[in-house]
From Swiss-Prot:
CoV N NTD domain ranges (all copies): 60-189
Protein name: Nucleoprotein
GO molecular function, one term: RNA binding
Keywords for this protein: ADP-ribosylation, Host Golgi apparatus, Phosphoprotein, Ribonucleoprotein, RNA-binding, Transcription, Transcription regulation, Viral nucleoprotein, Virion
Organism name: Human coronavirus HKU1 (isolate N1)
Length: 441
Protein backbone atom coordinates (compact mmCIF):
# COMPACT_ATOMS: atom_id res chain seq x y z
CA UNK A 1 0.00 0.00 0.00
CA UNK A 2 1.30 3.44 -0.93
CA UNK A 3 1.30 6.21 1.64
CA UNK A 4 0.02 9.68 0.85
CA UNK A 5 1.34 12.65 2.85
CA UNK A 6 -1.47 14.26 4.82
CA UNK A 7 -3.62 11.08 4.80
CA UNK A 8 -4.14 8.82 7.77
CA UNK A 9 -4.50 5.16 6.92
CA UNK A 10 -8.12 4.03 7.38
CA UNK A 11 -9.43 7.54 8.07
CA UNK A 12 -12.75 8.71 6.68
CA UNK A 13 -11.72 11.55 4.47
CA UNK A 14 -13.70 13.05 1.67
CA UNK A 15 -12.48 13.17 -1.88
CA UNK A 16 -11.04 16.04 -3.88
CA UNK A 17 -9.20 18.88 -2.24
CA UNK A 18 -10.50 17.95 1.25
CA UNK A 19 -8.57 14.69 1.35
CA UNK A 20 -6.98 15.14 4.75
CA UNK A 21 -4.10 17.42 3.77
CA UNK A 22 -2.67 19.18 6.81
CA UNK A 23 -2.63 22.66 5.34
CA UNK A 24 -3.18 23.64 1.73
CA UNK A 25 -1.29 26.48 0.16
CA UNK A 26 -0.81 27.43 -3.48
CA UNK A 27 2.79 27.84 -4.57
CA UNK A 28 3.51 29.99 -7.59
CA UNK A 29 6.16 27.69 -9.04
CA UNK A 30 4.10 24.51 -8.69
CA UNK A 31 0.39 25.17 -9.14
CA UNK A 32 -1.73 27.82 -10.85
CA UNK A 33 -5.16 26.38 -10.18
CA UNK A 34 -8.20 28.56 -9.70
CA UNK A 35 -6.36 31.47 -11.28
CA UNK A 36 -9.62 33.00 -12.49
CA UNK A 37 -10.85 33.43 -8.91
CA UNK A 38 -8.58 36.38 -8.24
CA UNK A 39 -8.27 37.65 -11.80
CA UNK A 40 -11.75 39.12 -12.26
CA UNK A 41 -12.08 41.84 -14.82
CA UNK A 42 -8.73 40.99 -16.39
CA UNK A 43 -7.74 39.05 -19.41
CA UNK A 44 -7.47 35.37 -18.62
CA UNK A 45 -3.84 34.24 -18.57
CA UNK A 46 -2.88 30.85 -20.00
CA UNK A 47 -2.43 28.12 -17.41
CA UNK A 48 1.07 26.70 -17.43
CA UNK A 49 1.35 22.94 -17.32
CA UNK A 50 4.35 20.67 -17.15
CA UNK A 51 4.74 20.75 -20.93
CA UNK A 52 3.89 24.42 -21.54
CA UNK A 53 5.81 26.21 -18.75
CA UNK A 54 8.58 28.55 -19.98
CA UNK A 55 12.12 27.23 -20.05
CA UNK A 56 14.21 28.07 -16.97
CA UNK A 57 11.26 27.86 -14.59
CA UNK A 58 10.00 24.35 -15.35
CA UNK A 59 9.38 21.90 -12.56
CA UNK A 60 8.77 18.57 -14.28
CA UNK A 61 8.06 16.77 -10.99
CA UNK A 62 5.85 18.11 -8.24
CA UNK A 63 7.10 17.92 -4.68
CA UNK A 64 4.77 17.29 -1.77
CA UNK A 65 6.28 20.22 0.13
CA UNK A 66 7.04 23.89 -0.29
CA UNK A 67 10.58 24.79 -1.27
CA UNK A 68 13.56 26.14 0.62
CA UNK A 69 14.98 29.26 -1.06
CA UNK A 70 18.54 30.50 -0.83
CA UNK A 71 18.97 34.20 -0.06
CA UNK A 72 22.71 34.42 0.69
CA UNK A 73 25.30 33.58 -1.92
CA UNK A 74 28.07 31.13 -1.10
CA UNK A 75 26.04 29.15 1.45
CA UNK A 76 25.98 25.35 1.22
CA UNK A 77 22.72 23.45 1.44
CA UNK A 78 23.11 20.71 4.04
CA UNK A 79 21.44 19.04 7.00
CA UNK A 80 22.91 17.10 9.89
CA UNK A 81 22.74 13.31 9.85
CA UNK A 82 19.20 12.12 10.58
CA UNK A 83 17.66 15.54 9.86
CA UNK A 84 16.18 17.22 6.79
CA UNK A 85 13.05 15.12 6.11
CA UNK A 86 9.89 17.30 6.32
CA UNK A 87 7.04 16.34 8.62
CA UNK A 88 4.21 14.59 6.76
CA UNK A 89 1.24 13.11 8.62
CA UNK A 90 0.35 9.71 7.30
CA UNK A 91 3.93 8.76 6.34
CA UNK A 92 5.60 6.43 8.89
CA UNK A 93 9.20 7.07 10.02
CA UNK A 94 10.37 4.03 8.07
CA UNK A 95 9.47 5.85 4.83
CA UNK A 96 11.03 9.20 5.82
CA UNK A 97 13.87 9.11 3.29
CA UNK A 98 14.61 10.98 0.11
CA UNK A 99 16.58 13.88 -1.30
CA UNK A 100 16.51 17.63 -1.79
CA UNK A 101 16.73 18.69 -5.42
CA UNK A 102 18.20 22.05 -6.47
CA UNK A 103 15.91 23.88 -8.88
CA UNK A 104 17.62 26.53 -11.02
CA UNK A 105 15.32 29.52 -11.28
CA UNK A 106 14.93 32.02 -14.08
CA UNK A 107 16.79 35.29 -14.49
CA UNK A 108 15.20 38.73 -14.65
CA UNK A 109 16.16 42.15 -15.92
CA UNK A 110 16.96 44.85 -13.38
CA UNK A 111 16.04 48.52 -13.67
CA UNK A 112 19.41 49.34 -15.24
CA UNK A 113 18.95 46.68 -17.91
CA UNK A 114 21.22 43.99 -16.45
CA UNK A 115 20.27 40.32 -16.29
CA UNK A 116 20.27 38.91 -12.79
CA UNK A 117 19.98 35.24 -11.91
CA UNK A 118 17.73 34.29 -9.02
CA UNK A 119 19.29 32.11 -6.37
CA UNK A 120 18.19 28.46 -6.49
CA UNK A 121 15.32 26.85 -4.62
CA UNK A 122 15.38 23.31 -3.23
CA UNK A 123 12.49 20.81 -3.24
CA UNK A 124 12.16 17.52 -1.37
CA UNK A 125 11.28 14.22 -3.06
CA UNK A 126 10.85 10.84 -1.43
CA UNK A 127 13.29 8.10 -2.38
CA UNK A 128 12.14 6.53 -5.65
CA UNK A 129 10.17 9.59 -6.82
CA UNK A 130 10.96 12.88 -8.50
CA UNK A 131 13.60 13.69 -11.12
CA UNK A 132 16.02 11.07 -9.75
CA UNK A 133 13.54 8.29 -9.09
CA UNK A 134 15.98 5.62 -10.31
CA UNK A 135 18.97 6.84 -8.26
CA UNK A 136 20.23 4.94 -5.23
CA UNK A 137 20.40 6.62 -1.85
CA UNK A 138 23.72 8.40 -1.33
CA UNK A 139 24.65 8.43 -5.02
CA UNK A 140 26.84 11.41 -5.93
CA UNK A 141 24.67 13.69 -8.07
CA UNK A 142 25.01 17.37 -8.87
CA UNK A 143 22.36 19.45 -7.10
CA UNK A 144 21.14 16.58 -4.88
CA UNK A 145 21.40 16.29 -1.10
CA UNK A 146 20.27 13.01 0.48
CA UNK A 147 18.41 12.95 3.81
CA UNK A 148 16.82 10.17 5.84
CA UNK A 149 15.37 9.41 9.24
CA UNK A 150 17.43 7.16 11.51
CA UNK A 151 14.57 4.62 11.43
CA UNK A 152 14.34 4.54 7.62
CA UNK A 153 15.78 1.76 5.46
CA UNK A 154 17.59 3.55 2.63
CA UNK A 155 18.27 0.36 0.65
CA UNK A 156 14.72 0.29 -0.77
CA UNK A 157 12.58 3.04 -2.33
CA UNK A 158 9.97 4.71 -0.18
CA UNK A 159 6.39 3.56 -0.55
CA UNK A 160 4.98 7.08 -1.05
CA UNK A 161 2.82 8.02 -4.00
CA UNK A 162 3.65 10.90 -6.31
CA UNK A 163 1.71 14.13 -6.01
CA UNK A 164 -1.00 15.00 -8.52
CA UNK A 165 -1.03 18.84 -8.71
CA UNK A 166 -4.58 18.91 -10.11
CA UNK A 167 -6.11 17.49 -6.93
CA UNK A 168 -3.38 17.70 -4.28
CA UNK A 169 -1.77 20.89 -3.09
CA UNK A 170 1.66 21.31 -1.56
CA UNK A 171 2.18 21.03 2.19
CA UNK A 172 4.13 23.79 3.96
CA UNK A 173 7.55 22.46 4.90
CA UNK A 174 7.93 21.81 8.62
CA UNK A 175 10.73 20.00 10.42
CA UNK A 176 10.86 18.11 13.74
CA UNK A 177 12.08 20.06 16.79
CA UNK A 178 15.85 20.37 16.91
CA UNK A 179 16.34 20.47 13.15
CA UNK A 180 18.94 23.04 12.09
CA UNK A 181 18.00 24.82 8.89
CA UNK A 182 20.92 25.59 6.53
CA UNK A 183 22.29 29.08 7.01
CA UNK A 184 21.42 31.50 4.23
CA UNK A 185 18.12 29.75 3.41
CA UNK A 186 14.48 30.26 4.36
CA UNK A 187 11.41 28.04 4.05
CA UNK A 188 8.82 29.29 1.59
CA UNK A 189 5.63 30.41 3.36
CA UNK A 190 7.02 30.10 6.88
CA UNK A 191 5.63 32.64 9.34
CA UNK A 192 3.43 34.43 6.80
CA UNK A 193 -0.13 33.30 7.21
CA UNK A 194 -0.03 30.54 9.81
CA UNK A 195 -0.41 32.90 12.75
CA UNK A 196 -3.27 34.73 11.08
CA UNK A 197 -5.23 31.75 9.81
CA UNK A 198 -5.44 29.50 12.86
CA UNK A 199 -7.27 31.65 15.44
CA UNK A 200 -10.07 32.71 13.08
CA UNK A 201 -10.55 29.49 11.16
CA UNK A 202 -13.31 28.10 13.40
CA UNK A 203 -15.21 31.37 13.75
CA UNK A 204 -15.08 31.97 10.01
CA UNK A 205 -16.46 28.54 9.23
CA UNK A 206 -19.44 29.12 11.54
CA UNK A 207 -20.34 32.60 10.33
CA UNK A 208 -22.91 33.29 7.60
CA UNK A 209 -20.37 35.01 5.36
CA UNK A 210 -17.77 32.29 5.59
CA UNK A 211 -17.70 31.80 1.82
CA UNK A 212 -16.78 35.42 1.06
CA UNK A 213 -14.29 35.51 3.92
CA UNK A 214 -12.60 32.34 2.77
CA UNK A 215 -12.39 33.74 -0.76
CA UNK A 216 -10.76 36.96 0.45
CA UNK A 217 -8.39 35.07 2.73
CA UNK A 218 -7.48 32.75 -0.12
CA UNK A 219 -6.72 35.77 -2.28
CA UNK A 220 -4.56 37.25 0.48
CA UNK A 221 -2.64 34.02 1.02
CA UNK A 222 -2.01 33.62 -2.69
CA UNK A 223 -0.59 37.10 -3.11
CA UNK A 224 1.43 36.71 0.06
CA UNK A 225 3.02 33.44 -0.99
CA UNK A 226 4.29 34.64 -4.37
CA UNK A 227 8.03 35.23 -4.23
CA UNK A 228 9.10 38.43 -5.91
CA UNK A 229 12.20 38.26 -8.12
CA UNK A 230 14.18 40.57 -5.87
CA UNK A 231 12.98 39.14 -2.56
CA UNK A 232 16.18 37.15 -2.00
CA UNK A 233 18.27 40.25 -2.56
CA UNK A 234 16.07 42.27 -0.22
CA UNK A 235 16.52 39.72 2.54
CA UNK A 236 20.27 39.58 1.96
CA UNK A 237 20.51 43.37 2.09
CA UNK A 238 18.53 43.47 5.33
CA UNK A 239 20.81 40.88 6.91
CA UNK A 240 23.96 42.69 5.77
CA UNK A 241 22.57 46.01 6.94
CA UNK A 242 21.79 44.51 10.34
CA UNK A 243 25.29 43.06 10.62
CA UNK A 244 26.86 46.32 9.54
CA UNK A 245 24.80 48.29 12.02
CA UNK A 246 25.75 46.05 14.91
CA UNK A 247 29.44 45.99 13.97
CA UNK A 248 29.87 49.77 13.95
CA UNK A 249 31.79 50.94 17.03
CA UNK A 250 29.99 53.34 19.31
CA UNK A 251 31.42 56.83 18.96
CA UNK A 252 32.13 58.81 22.11
CA UNK A 253 31.64 62.55 21.77
CA UNK A 254 33.29 65.19 23.92
CA UNK A 255 30.09 65.56 25.92
CA UNK A 256 29.91 61.80 26.55
CA UNK A 257 33.56 61.71 27.57
CA UNK A 258 32.94 64.56 29.99
CA UNK A 259 30.00 62.71 31.54
CA UNK A 260 32.06 59.52 31.87
CA UNK A 261 34.88 61.44 33.54
CA UNK A 262 32.49 63.14 35.95
CA UNK A 263 30.87 59.81 36.85
CA UNK A 264 34.26 58.26 37.64
CA UNK A 265 35.56 61.19 39.69
CA UNK A 266 32.44 61.36 41.86
CA UNK A 267 33.22 57.88 43.19
CA UNK A 268 35.47 57.33 46.21
CA UNK A 269 39.15 57.22 45.34
CA UNK A 270 39.47 53.48 45.92
CA UNK A 271 36.50 52.78 43.62
CA UNK A 272 37.73 54.67 40.57
CA UNK A 273 38.71 52.87 37.38
CA UNK A 274 40.94 54.98 35.11
CA UNK A 275 40.49 54.62 31.36
CA UNK A 276 41.17 56.57 28.18
CA UNK A 277 38.38 59.04 29.04
CA UNK A 278 39.57 59.64 32.61
CA UNK A 279 43.28 58.88 32.86
CA UNK A 280 45.38 57.80 35.83
CA UNK A 281 46.53 61.29 36.75
CA UNK A 282 42.96 62.59 36.83
CA UNK A 283 41.89 59.71 39.09
CA UNK A 284 44.89 59.41 41.43
CA UNK A 285 47.22 62.34 40.78
CA UNK A 286 50.77 62.55 39.48
CA UNK A 287 53.31 59.78 39.84
CA UNK A 288 55.78 59.93 42.69
CA UNK A 289 57.44 57.85 45.43
CA UNK A 290 54.06 56.88 46.94
CA UNK A 291 52.42 56.19 43.55
CA UNK A 292 55.22 54.83 41.42
CA UNK A 293 53.52 52.62 38.82
CA UNK A 294 52.73 53.42 35.18
CA UNK A 295 54.60 54.59 32.11
CA UNK A 296 53.38 57.34 29.82
CA UNK A 297 51.20 55.04 27.68
CA UNK A 298 49.55 53.24 30.60
CA UNK A 299 48.95 56.51 32.45
CA UNK A 300 47.13 57.76 29.37
CA UNK A 301 44.95 54.69 28.72
CA UNK A 302 44.52 53.31 32.24
CA UNK A 303 42.70 50.00 32.25
CA UNK A 304 42.19 50.30 28.46
CA UNK A 305 45.89 49.66 27.96
CA UNK A 306 46.39 46.29 26.18
CA UNK A 307 48.93 45.26 28.84
CA UNK A 308 46.64 45.88 31.79
CA UNK A 309 44.62 42.62 31.70
CA UNK A 310 47.71 40.51 32.36
CA UNK A 311 48.54 42.73 35.34
CA UNK A 312 44.99 42.37 36.64
CA UNK A 313 45.67 38.64 37.07
CA UNK A 314 48.08 39.59 39.87
CA UNK A 315 45.57 41.78 41.70
CA UNK A 316 44.50 40.35 45.08
CA UNK A 317 40.95 39.31 45.79
CA UNK A 318 38.95 41.22 48.43
CA UNK A 319 39.56 38.34 50.83
CA UNK A 320 43.31 38.42 50.21
CA UNK A 321 43.33 42.18 50.62
CA UNK A 322 41.70 42.15 54.07
CA UNK A 323 43.11 38.92 55.47
CA UNK A 324 46.52 38.92 53.80
CA UNK A 325 47.58 42.51 54.45
CA UNK A 326 48.67 44.63 57.39
CA UNK A 327 45.95 47.20 58.00
CA UNK A 328 46.08 50.41 60.05
CA UNK A 329 43.19 52.79 60.64
CA UNK A 330 44.29 56.42 60.73
CA UNK A 331 42.15 59.48 61.35
CA UNK A 332 42.85 62.45 59.15
CA UNK A 333 42.25 66.10 59.87
CA UNK A 334 38.94 67.38 58.56
CA UNK A 335 39.10 69.17 55.26
CA UNK A 336 38.57 72.92 55.14
CA UNK A 337 35.50 72.72 52.93
CA UNK A 338 33.75 70.16 55.16
CA UNK A 339 34.97 70.48 58.78
CA UNK A 340 32.07 68.45 60.18
CA UNK A 341 33.18 65.24 58.47
CA UNK A 342 35.36 62.67 60.18
CA UNK A 343 37.88 61.42 57.62
CA UNK A 344 39.64 58.09 58.07
CA UNK A 345 42.25 56.28 56.03
CA UNK A 346 42.81 52.54 56.01
CA UNK A 347 46.51 52.05 55.41
CA UNK A 348 47.53 48.68 54.06
CA UNK A 349 50.74 46.90 53.22
CA UNK A 350 51.22 43.44 51.80
CA UNK A 351 52.78 41.50 48.97
CA UNK A 352 51.78 39.54 45.89
CA UNK A 353 53.83 36.38 45.45
CA UNK A 354 54.31 34.61 42.10
CA UNK A 355 57.00 32.46 40.47
CA UNK A 356 58.28 31.56 37.03
CA UNK A 357 55.65 28.82 36.57
CA UNK A 358 52.90 31.44 36.31
CA UNK A 359 51.45 31.53 32.77
CA UNK A 360 52.78 34.59 30.95
CA UNK A 361 55.58 35.05 33.48
CA UNK A 362 58.01 36.63 31.00
CA UNK A 363 55.40 39.08 29.76
CA UNK A 364 54.43 40.03 33.30
CA UNK A 365 58.05 40.70 34.22
CA UNK A 366 58.53 42.81 31.10
CA UNK A 367 55.44 44.90 31.83
CA UNK A 368 56.43 45.37 35.47
CA UNK A 369 59.93 46.50 34.54
CA UNK A 370 58.52 49.01 32.06
CA UNK A 371 56.05 50.52 34.54
CA UNK A 372 57.69 50.37 37.98
CA UNK A 373 59.24 53.79 38.79
CA UNK A 374 58.79 54.80 35.17
CA UNK A 375 58.09 58.35 36.32
CA UNK A 376 61.76 58.77 37.35
CA UNK A 377 63.10 58.17 33.86
CA UNK A 378 60.29 60.24 32.39
CA UNK A 379 61.17 63.21 34.60
CA UNK A 380 64.87 62.92 33.82
CA UNK A 381 64.27 62.79 30.08
CA UNK A 382 61.87 65.71 30.24
CA UNK A 383 64.26 67.79 32.36
CA UNK A 384 67.18 67.17 30.04
CA UNK A 385 65.08 68.02 27.01
CA UNK A 386 63.87 71.23 28.64
CA UNK A 387 67.39 72.33 29.65
CA UNK A 388 68.98 71.46 26.31
CA UNK A 389 66.30 72.86 24.03
CA UNK A 390 66.90 76.30 22.65
CA UNK A 391 64.14 78.89 22.87
CA UNK A 392 62.69 80.16 19.63
CA UNK A 393 63.94 83.58 18.63
CA UNK A 394 61.49 86.23 17.68
CA UNK A 395 61.93 87.41 14.13
CA UNK A 396 63.77 90.73 13.97
CA UNK A 397 64.75 90.72 17.68
CA UNK A 398 68.33 90.05 18.74
CA UNK A 399 68.75 88.30 22.08
CA UNK A 400 71.81 88.53 24.29
CA UNK A 401 73.57 85.46 25.79
CA UNK A 402 72.38 86.39 29.28
CA UNK A 403 68.77 86.17 28.08
CA UNK A 404 69.31 82.62 26.78
CA UNK A 405 70.67 81.50 30.15
CA UNK A 406 67.81 83.01 32.11
CA UNK A 407 65.23 81.46 29.79
CA UNK A 408 66.72 77.99 30.05
CA UNK A 409 66.98 78.21 33.81
CA UNK A 410 63.43 79.46 34.32
CA UNK A 411 61.97 76.77 32.05
CA UNK A 412 63.81 73.99 33.83
CA UNK A 413 62.97 75.31 37.27
CA UNK A 414 59.30 75.64 36.42
CA UNK A 415 59.08 72.05 35.14
CA UNK A 416 60.84 70.63 38.18
CA UNK A 417 58.59 72.59 40.52
CA UNK A 418 55.47 71.21 38.85
CA UNK A 419 56.58 67.56 38.84
CA UNK A 420 57.88 67.26 42.40
CA UNK A 421 55.61 65.74 45.03
CA UNK A 422 55.28 67.06 48.61
CA UNK A 423 57.82 64.45 49.74
CA UNK A 424 60.28 65.75 47.17
CA UNK A 425 59.81 69.35 48.34
CA UNK A 426 60.55 68.36 51.93
CA UNK A 427 63.69 66.61 50.74
CA UNK A 428 64.78 69.75 48.87
CA UNK A 429 64.18 71.86 51.98
CA UNK A 430 66.49 69.57 53.93
CA UNK A 431 69.17 69.90 51.27
CA UNK A 432 68.92 73.72 51.48
CA UNK A 433 69.85 73.71 55.21
CA UNK A 434 73.41 74.93 55.95
CA UNK A 435 76.05 72.27 56.07
CA UNK A 436 77.23 71.36 59.60
CA UNK A 437 80.46 69.43 59.97
CA UNK A 438 80.33 66.45 62.27
CA UNK A 439 82.31 66.94 65.48
CA UNK A 440 84.84 64.38 66.51
CA UNK A 441 84.47 63.25 70.08
Amino acid sequence: MSYTPGHYAGSRSSSGNRSGILKKTSWADQSERNYQTFNRGRKTQPKFTVSTQPQGNTIPHYSWFSGITQFQKGRDFKFSDGQGVPIAFGVPPSEAKGYWYRHSRRSFKTADGQQKQLLPRWYFYYLGTGPYANASYGESLEGVFWVANHQADTSTPSDVSSRDPTTQEAIPTRFPPGTILPQGYYVEGSGRSASNSRPGSRSQSRGPNNRSLSRSNSNFRHSDSIVKPDMADEIANLVLAKLGKDSKPQQVTKQNAKEIRHKILTKPRQKRTPNKHCNVQQCFGKRGPSQNFGNAEMLKLGTNDPQFPILAELAPTPGAFFFGSKLDLVKRDSEADSPVKDVFELHYSGSIRFDSTLPGFETIMKVLEENLNAYVNSNQNTDSDSLSSKPQRKRGVKQLPEQFDSLNLSAGTQHISNDFTPEDHSLLATLDDPYVEDSVA
